[in-house]
Design a protein with these regions (language model features):
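Alpha-helical transmembrane segments within multi-pass membrane transporters and channels
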Residues: 1-39, 208
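Transmembrane alpha-helical segments in multi-pass inner-membrane proteins
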Residues: 8, 155, 165-234
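Membrane-interface helix caps of multi-pass small-molecule transporters
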Residues: 12-24, 46-50, 112-113, 161-164, ...
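Terminal peptide-recognition signature
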Residues: 14, 20, 38, 123, ...
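Transmembrane helix-bundle core of multi-pass membrane transporters
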Residues: 32, 36-116, 171, 224-229, ...
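Hydrophobic core segments of alpha-helical transmembrane domains in multi-pass membrane transport
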Residues: 37-44, 100-112, 151-159, 182-190, ...
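Helix-loop-helix "hairpin" substructures at the membrane interface of multi-pass membrane proteins
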Residues: 78, 90-170
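Cytosolic-side transmembrane-helix boundaries in multi-pass membrane proteins
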Residues: 128-142, 213-276
Length: 276
């Protein structure tokens, strides 16, 4: 039910964000940040003030003591690992969530198939150079909106799978945490701002999840406090994203400078040829 409800919401948000980004070409990165902050404020307004007075809440245990708004953490123990347990196989005492793995594999196959379709090729062309794509007859604005819709729908499904696996819902931080960790995992796996692959996803998840396990234990061994490892993990998450953005901007400026020098050299060679 949650997945079904998430689809129209994700589609509407994807269309809205895509249209906003179409009006901010060349400034997509900072615009995306501002949209994220704005939508976070809208979301918190709904869960803090609309839940109860406007949107009815049946279970009083979900409400804040004041009578409206949602508590900081909502327990999902009744549905914890409900998807994982639907088709689980125990191998050597280790439970393997087969259905969840099938869904992940299906998503990967969909992406591989989609990249070979005309729309997938159009998206790739738009991502590489919008002006060249427009000259080739591609509707750049429409393609960007569709790509954003697909992204938000996948993100909604991913959030639902994540929450049912964890078994609790941090009302005011869950959406920011999973987004930050997903970006960091992708970058750790070798992805860049311009390009990412399925290989980067799996490698990043393995490395990042390993850090989740190792960091608290390392903090306990070195300082006697596991929270030091937790702080280190958060630091690495933000540091990886920051370094990736700095490297991307430096690479972009270097390429622009090289193109300018090449253009100047070509013009000089042309003038010398005319002089002869």
């Amino acid at each position: 039910l949650a997945a079904i409800i998430s689809i129209p919401i994700s589609v509407l948000l994807g269309i809205m964000i895509g249209k906003l980004l179409n009006r901010a070409k060349g400034r997509e990165m900072i615009t995306s940040y501002m949209i994220a902050f704005a939508m976070d404020g809208v979301y918190q307004f709904f869960v803090l003030f609309m839940m109860g007075p406007v949107i009815p809440i049946i279970h009083n245990t979900l409400k804040l003591p004041r009578g409206y708004g949602i508590r900081n953490t909502v327990s999902l123990l009744n549905m914890r690992q409900s998807l994982d347990n639907l088709l689980a196989v125990s191998v050597g005492g280790v439970k393997t969530p087969v259905l969840t793995l099938i869904i992940i594999a299906a998503a990967c196959l969909f992406i591989l198939w989609f990249r070979r379709t005309k729309l997938g090729q159009d998206m790739r062309a738009v991502g590489q150079d919008m002006e060249v794509a427009r000259d080739a007859g591609i509707n750049v604005e429409r393609t960007r909106v569709i790509s954003m819709v697909i992204s938000t729908v996948f993100a909604g499904f991913g959030m639902i799978i994540y929450l049912q696996n964890v078994g609790n819902f941090p009302t005011y931080t869950a959406h920011t945490q999973i987004g930050m960790f997903s970006i960091a995992a992708l970058l750790v796996g070798g992805a860049s701002v311009e390009k990412a692959s399925i290989k980067n996803v799996f490698l990043g998840v393995i490395l990042f999840h390993t850090m989740f396990i190792v960091a608290p234990r390392t903090g306990t061994v070195i300082t006697g406090d596991s929270m030091i490892g937790e702080y280190f993990r958060v630091f690495v998450s933000y540091a990886v994203i920051t370094i990736a953005l700095v490297m991307y901007e430096a690479k972009k400026r270097k390429a622009k400078s090289a193109a300018g020098l090449q253009l100047a050299a070509d013009q000089l060679a042309e003038e010398e040829a005319k002089a002869k």
